[in-house]
A protein has these predicted regions:
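A short, surface-exposed beta-strand/turn
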Residues: 90-100, 170-179, 239-252
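Folded interaction domains in cell-surface recognition and envelope-stress signaling
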Residues: 134-217
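General beta-strand recognition
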Residues: 74, 182, 223-225
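N-terminal beta-strand/beta-hairpin edge segment
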Residues: 49-128, 133-139, 154-157
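Short, cysteine-centered beta-strand-loop-beta hairpins and adjacent loop/turn segments enriched
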Residues: 80-86, 162-168, 231-236
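Hydrophobic membrane-targeting and insertion signals
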Residues: 1-61, 66, 82, 236-237, ...
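Extracytoplasmic/luminal low-complexity segments enriched in Pro/Gly and acidic/polar residues
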Residues: 191-252
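A mature extracytoplasmic/lumenal domain signature
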Residues: 58-60, 79-81, 96-98, 161, ...
């Protein structure tokens, strides 16, 4: 009898585990379906050659049907060719999306209210080096300075200047002054380094829907971001890169 009771307990535990796994798999399938649908819709309405990666946060996903809110959605495109910049990484992030149960299940979030909308573009050493004319440029954090963001940040640049046979290093400030991005050397009086590692440009030339509102240095890249609050999602806004006909032109 004791053996039978133990067997029944094991059966009950296995049943609970099976139900849990089945529910988890079903929830994952619904989430993957929504991510796939959003990705395909973004690709169809943008100039992206490849399907972007889409991630929807919140577990379990179907709980959004009851809470009527998707807490996080990210659309990311990696290694996208952009005129003047070369390959860049770009992303669009939506936070606190108010949805109906139907939108949760079918993945169509067009017109859904969003608490925070942000879009960012990241330039790695290759892309920034292309603007500076330095083919082997690398970007890192200055010593004893943690990654930062906002309207100002700092970075350390290393690369071989044209005509040189050895690499040079300089620390730079990253500033947003109105629509303009200003990168200036601050740790040396060497005029050649100051000229080589300095850069100014209008952030409205970036493939963003408006001038950048934040700049940060993180993970070997310099990122520019715009952020808006309390908007209603339009399909064109989900593209990680600004496209013709949405809000402003991409890089000219």
């Amino acid at each position: 009898m004791s053996v039978l009771r133990i067997d029944r307990r094991i059966v009950h535990i296995l049943l609970v585990v099976c139900v849990f796994i089945a529910a988890w798999v079903a929830d994952a399938c619904v989430a993957m379906h929504t991510e796939h649908k959003v990705a395909q819709a973004v690709k169809a309405n943008s100039r992206l050659e490849n399907t972007p990666d889409v991630f929807i946060g919140g577990t379990p996903y179907v709980w959004a049907a009851a809470s009527k809110e998707i807490p996080y959605l990210e659309v990311k495109a990696l290694d996208v060719e952009v005129p003047k910049l070369g390959m860049v990484n770009a992303s669009t992030v939506l936070r606190d999306i108010t949805v109906t149960p139907e939108q949760v299940m079918n993945g169509d979030i067009e017109g859904a209210p969003v608490s925070t909308y942000s879009r960012g573009i990241s330039l790695d050493g290759v892309a920034l080096g292309r603007l500076l004319g330095i083919t082997d440029l690398s970007i890192s954090n200055p010593d004893d300075i943690s990654p930062s963001g906002g309207t100002s940040a700092e970075a350390e640049l290393t690369g071989t200047l044209p005509g040189d046979t050895h690499k040079s290093t300089a620390k730079v400030t990253l500033r947003l002054v109105g629509p303009e991005f200003r990168m200036q050397v601050y740790d040396t009086d060497d005029e050649r380094l100051q000229k080589a590692f300095s850069l100014n440009f209008d952030t409205r030339q970036l493939p963003l829907p408006a001038q950048a509102t934040a700049v940060k240095m993180q993970g070997g890249t310099i990122s520019f971001e715009i952020q808006r609050r309390n908007i209603k999602v339009q399909l064109a806004q989900l593209s990680p890169l600004e496209i013709e006909g949405s809000e402003q032109k991409a890089v000219e």
